[in-house]
């Protein structure tokens, strides 16, 4: 069995240019406050750590919002127009 790296192409090794491009794309996904100036290969480790931290914070935020929504829904009449609107948004 062979292991695959990269996504698609010819099965060769990923180039430094491709790594730098992926780092730039990943950096662009982070909020402005988490971005480091001039991502280079030496900062790839830092960028990956920041990305992991950001993803964890997003998970916490989703959990918090889910809890808040559950609390809100438990206080509403299930047949109310507001409850129906919320249900339609969740579909």
From Swiss-Prot:
InterPro entries reported in the protein's UniProt record: bHLH_dom, HLH_DNA-bd_sf, PRE
GO biological process: one example: regulation of DNA-templated transcription
Domain of life, source organism: Eukaryota
bHLH domain boundaries: 3-58
Keywords, sorted A to Z: Growth regulation, Transcription, Transcription regulation
Pfam families assigned: bHLH_ILI
Alphabetized GO MF terms: protein dimerization activity
Secretion signal span: none
Family according to the record: Belongs to the bHLH protein family.
Quaternary structure note: Interacts with LO9-177.
Primary role: Atypical and probable non DNA-binding bHLH transcription factor that integrates multiple signaling pathways to regulate cell elongation and plant development.
Name assigned to this protein: Transcription factor ILI3
Organism, scientific name: Oryza sativa subsp. japonica
Source lineage: Eukaryota, Viridiplantae, Streptophyta, Embryophyta, Tracheophyta
């Amino acid at each position: 069995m062979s292991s695959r790296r990269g996504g698609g192409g010819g099965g060769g090794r990923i180039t430094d240019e491709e790594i730098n491009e992926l780092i730039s794309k990943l950096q662009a996904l982070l909020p402005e406050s988490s971005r480091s100036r001039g991502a280079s290969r030496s900062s790839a480790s830092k960028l990956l750590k920041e990305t992991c931290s950001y993803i964890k914070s997003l998970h916490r935020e989703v959990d918090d919002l889910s809890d808040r929504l559950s609390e809100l829904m438990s206080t509403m009449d299930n047949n109310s127009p507001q409850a129906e609107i919320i249900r339609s948004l969740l579909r």
